[in-house]
């Protein structure tokens, strides 16, 4: 009580009130706040206050021998007074200026190498062009973007091992460099940094920038590749944007872009083959992008795109848990559903079997040009809030959401039959049938949907069936918003499974991706994509198929030759001859094949008629299922360069030209490689010279295994027997001599014996 009285008494005095309201009361608290702990509480103020002093810097005593006491203007650079509490010298900021101008210069050769990413950025900005500034509302959506251009794609752990190996090679610690990219990077960097004086820690930081992809979740309206993100602060504000064209590319963006193109091409091609999954894997493993194996890029590159994710799933890698429909990425943000098969009738009374999602769910939909929030119940769209770049993009998003909702009025809006097929001529599943139908023409869908009057809500307006905005009415449940919907931020990856038709499912069996979702957009890759698989030969058109087919035969001629003489059927069935068939007119494929196979059989039967160039030239024609018509051809037609061109059965033509003197083959004027004829072509009896040291025992004997080529004979042990393929495609049984002395006589007897053995 006493205290309270005392306080009341004090408060009655006006001075007390003034002190308490106008002045800082507890100085101790404030002093404590700014002095406790090592952390500087107001760094900007501290800096200003320090720099106002004459000697704000302290330095080691040795500095006095390296810097004069006064500069050219006679200003003092350091004080003779010691710094209180340490044996350091107090130094003026002017000393820094003096040092920068007159101090020792070390070698700068390593700077561009260490600060590579910075030097490259300067070049890009120097050559970039900034356009006009436009003031307009910016629809930004947060996306996961790559923020440092010019990096490799190592994982944090891989990069850490490389950095330790480069910067601290003698430190103890288990480091295992396994991947190709780790080994090449380590080797390169060690060479670059010999004799480097820059502090190891700095080098380590800079290497990290170069090796690891750094991503941030940032609001973006416009380009998302790293060369745009590095100038994000210059190109878009809340209500303005500035046009910008980068002055150069960064390899990481090129890799991402080329990877997407390669993956799309591969998925599209795999879809039409007999076993899509096996074909896809074969192509991924045999493709290189910018000289790096595609499978290595897939393992390290976090790009999320439908085709890329299908390739990753095929390789057993984890992918994002969101799913794709109609080119939009759907992510369920709340609710749940169970799936049930249901039969529905279209407006054309066609029956469709659809998998209905029963239950209330909310999704975000993110596309390249539009985003949306979708709330739905069983076969009912409750609300759809869309934002997009333009009318077209908004319409696309609305169509996808309406189809996804599976509402009855959408299914009843179908006019005509649904019979869309994929590239392999298989019918699409019902949901994609509906989607394709309305993507072609959505008029009936929008007209049938129904409209409602709307309340005035900030930032939202209605949209009518003809896609015009309105503040009074809107299509039922649909609203247009000025605000974009952020991409799903989590980078969580899940285990998925893939079936042979390339449908990717999560562990609960939900389909996340299928080839129908792969974009048909064509683009030109920034980095060279080398598809070694014969399945991709046709990607560059008929000429490429032609050249590649002949190059493949030449490269594998030794094996092809043996198969040609021993097991032709197996040879004709090789997948490498598949693309070639599309060049041969359908009507004559079978006749050409029958004719060429008969011709080859005669070559095998008649001594001295083996002709390397002719076999190579005609071989691809023999791959089609043959028709025995007994027809003879002097030339065969193939469709290249937009018309039928003739290839002569005997002799050269513009398509296939073998130059006997240079021993090179040109296909359509392009060099297809060196072609070595058998030494005996056109000259009988040369086999005898080749078979010196071997005794010819007679006709081929299957018990001694498949025929060897003459080059493989050298591996035989003395006294060992083998079948051997000699010049004219004939096979004889030989034995390697036990003594060398009799080799000379071999040549004479060989010729006679071969004739006897064959006849």
Curated annotation (Swiss-Prot):
Which terms in the GO cellular component ontology are assigned? host cell mitochondrion; host cell nucleus; virion component
- Annotated phenotype, changing residue 738 to Q: Complete loss of nuclear localization
Task: Name where it's found.
Answer: Virion; Host nucleus; Host mitochondrion
Q: What is the effect of changing residue 130 to A?
A: Complete loss of replication. No effect on transcription
Q: What is the effect of changing residue 130 to Y?
A: Enhances viral replication
Keywords of the record: Cap snatching, Eukaryotic host gene expression shutoff by virus, Eukaryotic host transcription shutoff by virus, Host gene expression shutoff by virus, Host mitochondrion, Host nucleus, Host-virus interaction, Inhibition of host innate immune response by virus, Inhibition of host MAVS by virus, Inhibition of host RLR pathway by virus, Inhibition of host RNA polymerase II by virus, mRNA capping, mRNA processing, Viral immunoevasion, Viral transcription, Virion
Q: How does it assemble?
A: Influenza RNA polymerase is composed of three subunits: PB1, PB2 and PA. Interacts (via N-terminus) with PB1 (via C-terminus). Interacts with nucleoprotein NP (via N-terminus). Interacts (via N-terminus) with host MAVS (via N-terminus); this interaction inhibits host innate immune response. Interacts with host ANP32A (via C-terminus); this interaction promotes viral RNA synthesis.
Q: Which family does it belong to?
A: Belongs to the influenza viruses PB2 family.
**What is the name of the protein in this document?**
Polymerase basic protein 2
| Native source organism of the sequence | Influenza A virus (strain A/Wilson-Smith/1933 H1N1) (Influenza A virus (strain A/WS/1933 H1N1))
């Amino acid at each position: 009580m006493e205290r309270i009285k005392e306080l009341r008494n004090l408060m009655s005095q006006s001075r007390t009130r003034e002190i308490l309201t106008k002045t800082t009361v507890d100085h101790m608290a404030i002093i404590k706040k700014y002095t406790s702990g090592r952390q500087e509480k107001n760094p900007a103020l501290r800096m200003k206050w320090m720099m106002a002093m004459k000697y704000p810097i302290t330095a080691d005593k040795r500095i006095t021998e390296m810097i004069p006491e006064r500069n050219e203007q006679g200003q003092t650079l350091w004080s003779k007074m010691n710094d209180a509490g340490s044996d350091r010298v107090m130094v003026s900021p002017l000393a820094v200026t003096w040092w920068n101008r007159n101090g020792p210069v070390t070698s700068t050769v390593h700077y561009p190498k260490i600060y590579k990413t910075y030097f490259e950025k300067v070049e890009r900005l120097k050559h970039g062009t900034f356009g006009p500034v436009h003031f307009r509302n910016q629809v930004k959506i947060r996306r996961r973007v790559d923020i440092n251009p010019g990096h490799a794609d190592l994982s944090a752990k891989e990069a850490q091992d490389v950095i330790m190996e480069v910067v601290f090679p003698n430190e103890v610690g288990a480091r295992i460099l396994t991947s190709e990219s780790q080994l090449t990077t380590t080797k390169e960097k060690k060479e670059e940094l010999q004799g480097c004086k820059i502090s190891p820690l700095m080098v380590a930081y800079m290497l990290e920038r170069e090796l690891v992809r750094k991503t941030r979740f940032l609001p973006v309206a416009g380009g998302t590749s790293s060369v745009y993100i590095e100038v994000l602060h210059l190109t878009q504000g809340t209500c303005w944007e500035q046009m910008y064209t980068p002055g150069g590319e960064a390899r990481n963006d090129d890799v991402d872009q080329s990877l997407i193109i390669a993956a799309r091409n591969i998925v599209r091609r795999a879809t039409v083959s007999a076993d899509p999954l096996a074909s896809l894997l074969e192509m991924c493993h045999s493709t290189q992008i910018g000289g790096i194996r595609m499978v290595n890029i897939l393992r390290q590159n976090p790009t999320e795109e439908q085709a890329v994710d299908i390739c990753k799933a095929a390789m057993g890698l984890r992918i994002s848990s969101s799913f794709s429909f109609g080119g939009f990425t759907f992510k369920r943000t709340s609710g749940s559903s169970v799936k049930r098969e249901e039969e529905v009738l279209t407006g054309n009374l066609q029956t469709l079997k659809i998998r209905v999602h029963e239950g209330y769910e909310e999704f975000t939909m993110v596309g390249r040009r539009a985003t949306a929030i979708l709330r739905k119940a069983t076969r009912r769209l409750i609300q759809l809030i869309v934002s997009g770049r333009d009318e077209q993009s908004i319409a696309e998003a609305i169509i996808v959401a309406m189809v996804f909702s599976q509402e009855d009025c959408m299914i009843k809006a179908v006019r005509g039959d649904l019979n869309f097929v994929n590239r392999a001529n298989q019918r699409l599943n019902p949901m994609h049938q509906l989607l394709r139908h309305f993507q072609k023409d959505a008029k009936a869908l929008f007209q049938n949907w129904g409209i409602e009057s709307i309340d005035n809500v900030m930032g939202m307006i209605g949209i009518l069936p003809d896609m015009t905005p309105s503040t009074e009415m809107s299509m039922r449940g649909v609203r247009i918003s000025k605000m974009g919907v952020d991409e799903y931020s989590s980078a969580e990856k899940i285990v998925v499974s893939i079936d042979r038709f390339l449908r990717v499912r999560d562990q609960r069996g939900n389909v996340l991706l299928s080839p129908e979702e792969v974009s048909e957009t064509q683009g030109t890759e920034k980095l060279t994509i080398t598809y070694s698989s014969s399945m991709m030969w046709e990607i560059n058109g008929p000429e490429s198929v032609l050249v590649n087919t002949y190059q493949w035969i030449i490269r594998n001629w030794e094996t092809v030759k043996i198969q040609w003489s021993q097991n032709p059927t197996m040879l004709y069935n090789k997948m490498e001859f598949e693309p070639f068939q599309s060049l041969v007119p359908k009507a004559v494929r079978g006749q050409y094949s029958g004719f060429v196979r008969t011709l080859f059989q005669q070559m095998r039967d008649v001594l001295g008629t083996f002709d390397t160039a002719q076999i190579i030239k005609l071989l691809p024609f023999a791959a089609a299922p043959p028709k025995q018509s007994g027809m003879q051809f002097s030339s065969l037609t193939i469709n290249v360069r937009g018309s039928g061109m003739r290839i002569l059965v005997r002799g050269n033509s513009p398509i296939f030209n073998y130059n006997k003197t240079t021993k090179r083959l040109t296909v359509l004027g392009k060099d297809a490689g060196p072609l070595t004829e058998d030494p005996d072509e056109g000259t009988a009896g040369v086999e005898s010279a080749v078979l010196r040291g071997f005794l010819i025992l007679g006709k081929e004997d299957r018990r001694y295994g498949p025929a060897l080529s003459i080059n493989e004979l050298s591996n035989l042990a003395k006294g060992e027997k083998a079948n051997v393929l000699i010049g004219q495609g004939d096979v004889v049984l030989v034995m390697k001599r036990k003594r060398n002395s009799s080799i000379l006589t071999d040549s004479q007897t060989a010729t006679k014996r071969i004739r006897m053995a064959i006849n």
